[in-house]
Amino acid sequence: MRQEIHPKYTEVTVTCSCGNTFVTRSTAGKKEMNIDICSECHPFYTGKQRIVDTAGRVDKFKKRFGGMKKI
């Protein structure tokens, strides 16, 4: 391999909004990352059905299109 053409691959501490933290490796260049959902709180892995609403997108959609008549 050619030297010094590849990005640095460092350890990163990832923190989920549910409070779960874990360490992985990344080329992102940050020491810490924040994520909205992880395997501890994702509905597929937990078996619990819920709507993952980031920043009120579902409410915004219902507000915008909820009053429309069916065609």
From Swiss-Prot:
Zn(2+) binds at C16, C18, C38, C41. GO terms for molecular function: metal ion binding; rRNA binding; structural constituent of ribosome. InterPro entries: Ribosomal_bL28/bL31-like_sf, Ribosomal_bL31, Ribosomal_bL31_A, Ribosomal_bL31_sf. Disulfide bonds: none annotated. Keywords: Metal-binding, Ribonucleoprotein, Ribosomal protein, RNA-binding, rRNA-binding, Zinc. One of its GO terms (cellular component) is ribosome. HAMAP family: Ribosomal_bL31_1. Binds the 23S rRNA. This is Large ribosomal subunit protein bL31. It comes from Francisella tularensis subsp. tularensis (strain SCHU S4 / Schu 4). The gene is rpmE.
